[in-house]
Structure formats: structure tokens, C-alpha cells
């Protein structure tokens, strides 16, 4: 997305690398890059972007049939359809758009996961990545109209 199409104070579509797309309403729903996108519309939002760690192990027989979340540690564990344990969490304390994690955070998430599900210690780790997530100061999402008519936000 290159920018917003505007007529007066109204957003009428978006400009992309493949051309213009006109719309009566445009929604900004860009996990991890909402503040960047909002700036293209001239808006400043109280959102910071942080890296959230994620890992997946080799597949095993069913062990977890739902998402287990630990709010105090900002971590979660679930199991994929292919049997891999997916776990992650622990926001990096610095604003970043990097799709990788820093070693102390990676260690912290792995330590919490091992304490929660000790069986992880016997599994091969297949992948690790950092995903960018948007955070407000109180952790609540911003879902609203913007001052520009026709432009909405879910960030």
C-alpha cells in the first residue's frame, strides 16, 4: 500500500503498486505496522510496534488441544494441526520492525515454555521467528473511526 486516495477530508481508496483501488470505506488492519500506515494518512496513533517471539517444534501426538496463555509472562503455547508445539510471547522492550528476536528474549521465552511443558526439552525446534505486533500503552486495541471520513482503524 503506497498511500490513501483523498477527496477533501474524505478517504476514497488506496494507491497500491498495482494501481488505485477506490472504496467508500477503507479499514486500516495491518498488524504490526498500523502506526506506519496511519502516518500515510497524516495520523499519529498512540501505538508502538514490538517484536513478539514465536517458535515451533517437530510434530508430536496430541498434547495441547487449546491455547494455553500466561498473561503474567506474556506467553502462550498451542499445538498445530501437524502436531508441532507453537509457543511464544514476551515482547521485546524496544520499538522494532525486525522479524527476528534478541537472544535474552529468546532465552526467556524458551525458559518459560520448558517450565510449563517440560516435554519440549526432548523435541527438535524447527523454526523461530519474530513477528511484529502493535501495542498501545494499556494493551487495548484501537477500533474506531478516524478523523478522516471513510477511514477506519482496527489496530
Predicted regions and their residues:
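Central helical "cap/lid" subdomain
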Residues: 16, 20-65
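Short beta-strand micro-motifs in enzyme catalytic cores
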Residues: 12, 51-53, 141
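General structural feature for long, well-ordered alpha-helical segments within catalytic domains
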Residues: 10, 14, 22, 33, ...
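Active-site lid/adjacent beta-loop-alpha segment flanking the redox-cofactor pocket in flavoenzymes
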Residues: 44, 59-150
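Nucleotide phosphate-binding site architecture
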Residues: 2, 35, 152
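Active-site-proximal helix/loop microenvironment
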Residues: 155
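A conserved short coil-to-beta-strand element within the FAD-binding core of flavoproteins
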Residues: 1-12
Amino acid at each position: 500500500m503506497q498511500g490513501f486516495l483523498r477527496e477533501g477530508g474524505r478517504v476514497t481508496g488506496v494507491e497500491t503498486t498495482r494501481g488505485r483501488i477506490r472504496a467508500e470505506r477503507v479499514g486500516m488492519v495491518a498488524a504490526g505496522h498500523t502506526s506506519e500506515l496511519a502516518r500515510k494518512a497524516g495520523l499519529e496513533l498512540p501505538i508502538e510496534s514490538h517484536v513478539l517471539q514465536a517458535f515451533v517444534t517437530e510434530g508430536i501426538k496430541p498434547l495441547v488441544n487449546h491455547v494455553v496463555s500466561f498473561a503474567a509472562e506474556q506467553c502462550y503455547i498451542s499445538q498445530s494441526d501437524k502436531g508441532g508445539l507453537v509457543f511464544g510471547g514476551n515482547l521485546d522492550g524496544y520499538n522494532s520492525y525486525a522479524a527476528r528476536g534478541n537472544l535474552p528474549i529468546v532465552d526467556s521465552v524458551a525458559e518459560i515454555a520448558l517450565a510449563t511443558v517440560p516435554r519440549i526439552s526432548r523435541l527438535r525446534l524447527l523454526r523461530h521467528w519474530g513477528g511484529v505486533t502493535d501495542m498501545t500503552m494499556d494493551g487495548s486495541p484501537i477500533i474506531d473511526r478516524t478523523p478522516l471520513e471513510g477511514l477506519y482503524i482496527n489496530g
